[in-house]
A protein has these predicted regions:
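Glycine-rich beta-strand-to-loop/alpha-helix junction loops that act as flexible
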Residues: 129-134, 160-163
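Alpha/beta enzyme core
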Residues: 1-128, 137, 141-156, 181
Length: 183
């Protein structure tokens, strides 16, 4: 086929998560043996990640853990939603943590929350690409903001297919050029 990379998705927290981790880990190991790169979409999927009206599917600590697991199974690049909040560990009672982690290491700032995601990719050894999100009304500004946050946090870029390809060609190209200008 001539492929130079493979990609896969793991839905951490889903019923199939353990199987996905094992199968994709094997596939990534084989890909590396063949000299191929690996890309992993690390997404959280569990209704328990919503507590008291807050959705922790994009929580820096939970997505960071997903990123860490993804890099551990040999993902070269991790695609993840950009963190929008934090405190998922304490809210859902998952794992152990300390209040100073949230107060000192990852204050409530989008760059710091995304940096936490990068740190969990072995300090950027595996690249973090944030998703661009769904297409909407203010896509150009949102894409540039997401790109700036990703870059300042130490990420490698973003994937913005829906924002760019669900538009007229001229608008999509303008959006992609704006993202390229950031990087």
């Amino acid at each position: 086929m001539g492929a130079s990379a493979i990609g896969a998705t793991i839905y951490y927290g889903s019923q199939n998560c353990r199987r996905q981790i094992m199968e994709i880990s094997d596939a990534f190991q084989q890909a590396h043996e063949l000299g191929m790169a690996t890309v992993l979409w690390c997404y959280l999927r569990n209704p328990e990640f919503k507590k008291d009206g807050t959705d922790y599917h994009a929580s820096a600590d939970l997505t960071g853990q997903a990123n860490h697991l993804g890099v551990t199974i040999e993902a070269d690049i991790v695609k993840q939603k950009q963190a929008t909040n934090n405190g998922g560990y304490t809210a859902i009672g998952f794992g152990k943590t300390h209040p100073l982690v949230y107060e000192k290491l990852a204050p409530d700032n989008p760059i710091e929350l995304t940096r936490w995601q990068v740190v969990n990719c072995y300090m950027g050894r595996a690249g973090l690409i944030n998703s661009g999100g769904a297409s909407g009304d203010n896509d150009l500004a949102q894409a540039v903001t997401t790109a700036v946050i990703n870059k300042r946090a130490g990420g490698m870029g973003l994937i913005s297919g829906r924002k760019s390809f669900q538009k007229p060609m001229k608008d999509g190209v303008t959006l992609l050029n704006a993202i390229q200008d950031v990087f």
